[in-house]
Amino acid sequence: MSVGRRRGRILAFQALVAWDVGGAVLDDLLNFSWQNEDSIKDPNGYLFPKMMVLGTIENITEIDKVIQENLDNWVIDRLNSVDKAILRLSVYSLIYQKDTPPPIVIDEAINLAKDFGTDDSYKFVNAVLDSIKNKS
């Protein structure tokens, strides 16, 4: 059994936050051993979130450039780790994963921001991603 796409995005987001704050080893993140999901015994069950994490990290320079170009009066290095991880994951989806329509990517990002971010994170994430979508 594999994780669904929504759960996969949550796992990928959590892995990116852990990677960004610097305390997590990438190999540990990618096998999702930190998860306690008895129903996922198949290592292939994590292919979607693993692909999202690897794709985001492999393209981080371009992704961060796109984010920076769409920040008004902000510098990406000053963003909190939660908002940064949501934006990075979403920009990866917008640029490199053409199988998910942009409105769905943005909606998923807003949901992550509402669940894990500050009170205003979802507005900020929505504005940045909307700007990126409109320029592409």
Curated annotation (Swiss-Prot):
GO BP annotation list: DNA-templated transcription termination; transcription antitermination
InterPro entries attached to this UniProt entry: NusB-like_sf (IPR035926), NusB_fam (IPR011605), NusB_RsmB_TIM44 (IPR006027)
Origin: domain of life: Bacteria
Function: Involved in transcription antitermination. Required for transcription of ribosomal RNA (rRNA) genes. Binds specifically to the boxA antiterminator sequence of the ribosomal RNA (rrn) operons.
One of the Pfam families matching this protein, by short name: NusB
Keyword terms, alphabetized: RNA-binding, Transcription, Transcription antitermination, Transcription regulation
Cystine pairs: none
PANTHER family for the chain: ANTITERMINATION NUSB DOMAIN-CONTAINING PROTEIN, N UTILIZATION SUBSTANCE PROTEIN B-RELATED
Coiled coil ranges: none
CC annotations in GO: cytosol
UniProt cross-references to HAMAP family, sorted A to Z: NusB
CDD domains reported in the protein's UniProt record: Terminator_NusB (cd00619)
Similarity section: Belongs to the NusB family.
Protein name: Transcription antitermination protein NusB
One Gene Ontology term of the molecular function aspect: RNA binding
NCBIfam families membership: nusB
